[in-house]
Regions:
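Non-heme Fe(II)/2-oxoglutarate
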Residues: 1-68, 78
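Catalytic core of non-heme Fe(II) oxygenases with the double-stranded beta-helix
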Residues: 56, 60-165
Length: 165
């Protein structure tokens, strides 16, 4: 089931995470598809709750609301001109948190989810600060382009999960 939740975190926690992400030292040259030509900024957070640091509040809220085990978490970022490939994730469920509280709808940068045969987009979820997206990991999906009018970094926090037994 594909769903999204606005105002996922309490406002003051969302603001704190937004500020913390602006201080991250990003690493460039990550590809969402092995051997892919399109790269983006990325920072691996870890495989367990103890490695999440400042971003543990997001996971705590996810685990309070959903019955999934975190396999790994990481940060992704894009700017205008960087368009990741359509790809599928491993695991059972993917959670993407949008932290930028100042993001404008006309900047784009949402997430498109495609049908299994890649005949079309079934869901387009716009980027909105403090929004959590949840979708089955095997569905093809892609971060959407950022407008050339945007001079900000489109950031997200990603959690790859498996169903708890």
């Amino acid at each position: 089931m594909i769903e999204f939740t606005d105002n996922f975190l309490e406002e003051h926690i969302a603001q704190l995470i937004d500020m913390q992400l602006r201080e991250v030292s990003w690493k460039y040259d990550y590809d969402s598809v092995k051997g892919g030509t399109n790269k983006h900024w990325h920072l691996f957070l870890g495989h367990n709750i103890g490695e999440l640091g400042d971003f543990v509040a997001i996971w705590n809220q996810i685990s309070n609301n959903y019955n999934y085990k975190m396999e790994r978490a990481y940060l992704n970022a894009h700017t205008h001109g960087i368009e990741p490939h359509i790809h599928r994730d491993d695991g059972d469920m993917t959670f993407i948190y949008y932290p930028r509280m100042d993001w404008r709808i006309d900047w784009g940068g949402g997430t498109a989810i495609y049908d299994n045969d890649l005949n079309g987009i079934t869901h387009h979820i716009s980027y909105k600060g403090n929004r959590l997206i949840k979708f089955p990991a095997n569905l093809p999906h892609q971060a959407q382009p950022v407008s050339r009018e945007c001079y900000q970094l489109r950031t997200c926090v990603v959690f790859k999960t498996t169903r708890k037994k």
